[in-house]
Amino acid sequence: MDDLTTRLKALSSANEFLEFFGIAYEERVVHVNRLHILKRFYQYLHRAEGLAGLDDVEMFRRYRELLAQAYQDFTTSTAVKEKVFKVFQDADGQGHVSVTSLRDSLAERRKSAGGPELRAA
């Protein structure tokens, strides 16, 4: 196993990756988006072509570019807009629950539990 790969396997947090690659970052951005940044970095790595034949120096340079881009994505956008994780892809901002349906649901639960009924306001 090459030296770069061995060193990368020892890293676990977004902060560690950014520091390893010498990428300046704002802690508030990383704190909120750490998993999103790493997931996006992973996505960029899998889409990148020609990484297999690179030496450690060139691979470090390419990985650094991809991680910097992943971080940058979240300095100018949000996790919801970037939709890195499936939960954001599926939601697509369309979730809607009416107050009436919540009231009806709660009334049914109370009724089945033997509690007092709710009255509509």
Curated annotation (Swiss-Prot):
The keyword Kinase does not apply. The keyword Cytoplasm does not apply. Coiled coil: none annotated. GO terms for biological process: nitrogen fixation. It comes from the Bacteria. InterPro entries: NifW. Keywords: Nitrogen fixation. Homotrimer; associates with NifD. Belongs to the NifW family. May protect the nitrogenase Fe-Mo protein from oxidative damage. This is Nitrogenase-stabilizing/protective protein NifW.
